[in-house]
């Protein structure tokens, strides 16, 4: 049984802030993301994440905005930044690595991005998120629904869906987000 990181109100608000930054309207309202690769989508998401987290650090009392930005940039690891690497997690002889990690506020957060329109795409990300949950305090799993009728996004309020996403959150600290 793994010990879970506690879900204080402060931590939940911080995770919500990150969730909002990575699903910003400027990204999914304007970007033709169906035609973009996952890497290109991450390139669009990164500056929003930096900006929102910088504002957060400034709000926490760091008056120097440039210094706040440095703090944030050194807290985010992702493959798009040549100066950082995200460590692999070995599981059943396979190497697994989240798309992005954030270490801030005494929390280690993994972010997994998946783009797709089929159940297999969706399930792959859930499986990866569960592996990351063993090494990180929280996992944010952002699934980008590129199905023509948005059927995955539209189904997220269903009873089975809410039950599973509730279980992932309650038992694994995985926050499931669909864009």
Q: PLM features: what roles do these ranges have?
A:
Residues 33-34, 43, 55-107, 119-121:
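Active-site metal-binding core of divalent-cation-utilizing nuclease and nuclease-like domains
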Residues 1-68:
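Interdomain/boundary linker segments immediately adjacent to catalytic/signaling cores
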Residues 118-123, 133-172, 176-179:
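Nucleic-acid nuclease catalytic cores
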Residues 114:
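Activation of the activation-loop gatekeeper triad in protein kinase-fold domains
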Residues 111:
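Conserved beta3 VAIK motif of the Hanks protein kinase fold
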């Amino acid at each position: 049984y793994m010990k879970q990181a506690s879900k204080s109100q402060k931590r939940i608000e911080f995770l919500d802030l990150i969730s909002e930054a990575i699903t910003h309207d400027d990204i999914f309202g304007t970007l033709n993301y169906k035609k973009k690769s996952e890497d290109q989508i991450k390139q669009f998401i990164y500056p929003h994440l930096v900006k929102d987290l910088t504002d957060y650090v400034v709000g926490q009392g760091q008056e120097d905005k440039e210094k706040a930005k440095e703090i944030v940039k050194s807290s985010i690891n992702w493959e798009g930044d040549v100066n950082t690497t995200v460590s692999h997690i070995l599981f059943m002889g396979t190497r697994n690595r989240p798309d992005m990690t954030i270490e801030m506020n005494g929390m280690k957060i993994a972010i997994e991005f998946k783009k797709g329109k089929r159940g297999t795409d969706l399930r792959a990300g859930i499986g990866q998120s569960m592996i990351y949950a063993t090494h990180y305090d929280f996992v944010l799993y952002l699934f980008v629904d590129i199905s023509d009728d948005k059927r995955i996004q539209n189904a997220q309020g269903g009873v089975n869906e809410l039950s599973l996403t509730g279980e992932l959150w309650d038992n694994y600290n995985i926050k499931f987000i669909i864009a």
